């Protein structure tokens, strides 16, 4: 009986912690295979995707709050559907930014490929998002996406009553910096992501760009992605 109670408490904790951002399928897999879940933090190679809407502050000041949040939530719904489809897991919404990880909590050897394909699908979906915006007399919006593959420390932050699954580390910060270099409608990925993403990734013929992100000691080579397979931006 004590074992059954402990298992129920554990399941409740996992559902509270992960249920807000993992798909039902992934959540059930975690509950059925506790070896896939490392509570307390672990280092793992993952691919991190961060997206951000351009000029959102100006939009929020021009639009009434109800309309702005309705527009934002519709955008989130569209993006979440795509991220889930490509086996990504959303860790946070920071304002209008989406922070997603591929390869955690479930390992995924194709995390770089999935994240890059996901980003292309997200940018392609923006046409439909803006068609809906215009039908509601909302302004068109655009976003930039940064992707990097590297090591992060992942685990639960908080307590048994209130916890959040999150990631920290240099490579998480670098992904945010990469996103900051993107222009509207652009996808920039690191050398590490491009090398691991596979041959279906289509890079801009203009070639890579060398940048020095703030807070990063070394120069970083970034690649402008314009498609995945036959799906072009």
Q: What is the predicted role of each segment?
A:
Residues 37-117:
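Catalytic NTP-binding/metal-coordinating core of nucleotidyl cyclase/transferase enzymes
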Residues 1-44, 202:
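Regulatory cytosolic signal-relay segments
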Residues 152, 181-233:
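Cytosolic regulatory/linker segments at or just downstream of nucleotide-handling modules
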Residues 94-95, 135-146, 187-193:
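Acidic/histidine metal-binding catalytic segments
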Residues 72-88, 104-145, 149, 170-179:
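Alpha-helical scaffold within the catalytic cores of cyclic-nucleotide enzymes
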Residues 21-24, 122-132, 160, 175, ...:
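Conserved, well-folded catalytic cores of nucleic-acid-processing
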Residues 101-111, 145-163, 184-185:
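Catalytic strand-loop-helix junctions within cyclic-nucleotide turnover domains
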Residues 14, 26, 68, 75, ...:
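Helical mechanochemical/support elements of P-loop NTPase systems and associated helical scaffolds
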């Amino acid at each position: 009986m004590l074992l059954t109670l402990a298992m129920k408490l554990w399941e409740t904790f996992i559902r509270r912690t992960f249920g807000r951002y993992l798909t039902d399928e992934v959540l059930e897999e975690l509950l059925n295979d506790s070896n896939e879940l490392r509570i307390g933090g672990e280092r793992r190679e993952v691919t991190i995707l961060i997206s951000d809407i351009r000029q959102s502050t100006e939009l929020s000041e021009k639009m009434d709050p109800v309309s702005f949040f309705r527009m934002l939530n519709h955008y989130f719904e569209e993006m979440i559907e795509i991220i889930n489809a490509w086996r990504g897991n959303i860790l946070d919404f920071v304002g209008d930014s989406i922070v997603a990880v591929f390869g955690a909590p479930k390992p995924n050897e194709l995390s770089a490929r999935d994240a890059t394909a996901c980003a292309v699908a997200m940018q392609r979906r923006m046409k439909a998002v803006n068609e809906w915006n215009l039908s509601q007399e909302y302004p068109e919006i655009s976003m930039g996406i940064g992707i990097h593959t590297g090591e992060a420390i992942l685990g639960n932050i908080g307590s048994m009553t209130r916890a959040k699954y999150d990631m920290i580390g240099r490579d998480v910060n670098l992904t945010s910096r990469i996103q900051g270099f993107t222009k509207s409608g652009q996808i920039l990925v690191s050398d590490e992501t491009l090398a691991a993403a596979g041959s279906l990734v289509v890079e801009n013929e203009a070639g890579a760009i060398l940048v020095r992100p703030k807070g990063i000691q070394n120069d970083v080579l970034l690649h402008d992605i314009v498609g995945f397979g036959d799906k072009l931006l």
